[in-house]
């Protein structure tokens, strides 16, 4: 028997307001054709003032708990991956805990931008396997609309708000269910290629997203293909063994180029970027939840998750559902 972190449930939440490219073009110098051609994005959800990273994360968590057949009191660990917390402190994870009515447990945030959910899964996996908790909520939640420069069409058209969550539970299993391997990387010398130009210890302001798009694209395709190869080799798998890839939903061109580099057919890649845009740390769990709920991802499927974000940070995980 081997102790592993088993996927017990998924959930997601989106803000009430959905904005099309055409609607965005009414306030930004852009067009539907320009956005779709370069990104594949058609819609994004934008949070209203009463919708925050914590409230969206809590909504996604409730749905994941329901899918897992668990109550908030069962949870011993809450990790929220976010680059847009409600406050500098306390951690959004503690606010989610309060919103859920969960009792005393471990709760903290992880900040690795778009890779945050992969980092959080890796941390939760290690903590569950070593007995720190039996059940964990791992959440990616973002309100990136709060840090966008709406006069910069190269960035503001790319992002949306939302949340996704999974329940992972420690179980002793005889088969290969659960999280089988994770791989994480960071290369800080590229931190000025995708960043926010503000912060409490530098400007005292929130700041806005800034990006060197061409460089991000180049590094993303190379790094994501490499880390997917690494994590599959860790468990002795090839592309032919994978049932589904759930990639970070940043840009359809990046997703397509990465899949092509690995020899993965498009019909095995979960794609939601057209409906949600780039929701940063929320994108992978949000896409995972949709694919589970619509029946594409089924029990027994081998699923690979991958993401890259500012820093640069990047990572991948492979799990048997």
UniProtKB/Swiss-Prot annotation:
Catalyzes the condensation reaction of fatty acid synthesis by the addition to an acyl acceptor of two carbons from malonyl-ACP. Catalyzes the first condensation reaction which initiates fatty acid synthesis and may therefore play a role in governing the total rate of fatty acid production. Possesses both acetoacetyl-ACP synthase and acetyl transacylase activities. Its substrate specificity determines the biosynthesis of branched-chain and/or straight-chain of fatty acids. It is an enzyme of class 2 (transferase). The last Arg residue of the ACP-binding site is essential for the weak association between ACP/AcpP and FabH. One of its GO terms (molecular function) is 3-oxoacyl-[acyl-carrier-protein] synthase activity. Belongs to the thiolase-like superfamily. FabH family. This is Beta-ketoacyl-[acyl-carrier-protein] synthase III. Homodimer. Its EC number is 2.3.1.180. It catalyses: malonyl-[ACP] + acetyl-CoA + H(+) = 3-oxobutanoyl-[ACP] + CO2 + CoA. The active site is at residues 114, 248, 278. Residues 249-253 are annotated as: ACP-binding. HAMAP family: FabH (MF_01815). One of its GO terms (cellular component) is cytoplasm. Keywords: Acyltransferase, Cytoplasm, Fatty acid biosynthesis, Fatty acid metabolism, Lipid biosynthesis, Lipid metabolism, Multifunctional enzyme, Transferase. Its main location: cytoplasm. It is found in: Cytoplasm. CDD domains: KAS_III (cd00830). Gene3D superfamilies: 3.40.47.10. GO terms for biological process: fatty acid biosynthetic process; secondary metabolite biosynthetic process. Pathway: Lipid metabolism; fatty acid biosynthesis. PANTHER family: 3-OXOACYL-[ACYL-CARRIER-PROTEIN] SYNTHASE 3, BETA-KETOACYL-[ACYL-CARRIER-PROTEIN] SYNTHASE III. SUPFAM superfamilies: Thiolase-like. It comes from the Bacteria.
């Amino acid at each position: 028997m081997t102790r592993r972190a088993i996927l017990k449930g998924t959930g997601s939440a989106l803000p009430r307001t959905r904005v099309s490219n055409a609607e965005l073009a009414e306030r930004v110098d852009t067009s539907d054709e320009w956005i779709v051609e370069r990104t594949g994005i058609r819609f994004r959800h934008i949070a209203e003032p009463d919708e925050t990273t914590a409230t969206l994360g809590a909504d996604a968590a409730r749905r994941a708990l329901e899918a897992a057949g668990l109550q908030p009191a069962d949870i011993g660990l809450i990790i929220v991956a976010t680059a847009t917390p409600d406050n500098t402190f306390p951690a959004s994870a503690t606010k989610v805990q309060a919103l859920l009515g969960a009792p005393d447990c471990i709760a903290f945030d992880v900040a690795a931008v778009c890779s945050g959910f992969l980092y959080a899964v890796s941390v939760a996996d290690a903590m569950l396997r070593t007995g720190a908790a039996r059940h964990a909520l791992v959440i990616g939640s973002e309100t990136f609309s709060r840090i966008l420069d709406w006069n910069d069409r190269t960035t503001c058209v790319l992002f949306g708000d939302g949340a996704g969550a999974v329940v992972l539970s420690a179980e002793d299993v005889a088969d290969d269910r659960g999280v089988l391997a994770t791989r994480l990387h960071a290369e800080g010398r590229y931190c000025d290629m995708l960043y926010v130009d503000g912060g409490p210890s530098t400007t005292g302001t929130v700041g806005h997203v800034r990006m060197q798009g061409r460089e991000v694209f180049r590094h993303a395709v190379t790094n994501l293909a490499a880390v997917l190869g690494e994590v599959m080799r860790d468990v002795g798998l090839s592309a032919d063994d994978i049932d589904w890839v759930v990639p970070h939903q940043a840009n359809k061109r990046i997703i397509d180029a990465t899949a092509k580099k690995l020899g993965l057919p498009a019909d095995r890649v979960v794609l939601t970027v057209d409906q949600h845009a780039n929701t940063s740390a929320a994108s992978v769990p949000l896409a995972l939840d949709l694919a589970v709920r619509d029946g594409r991802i089924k029990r027994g499927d081998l699923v690979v998750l991958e993401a890259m974000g500012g820093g640069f940070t990047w990572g991948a995980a492979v799990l048997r559902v």
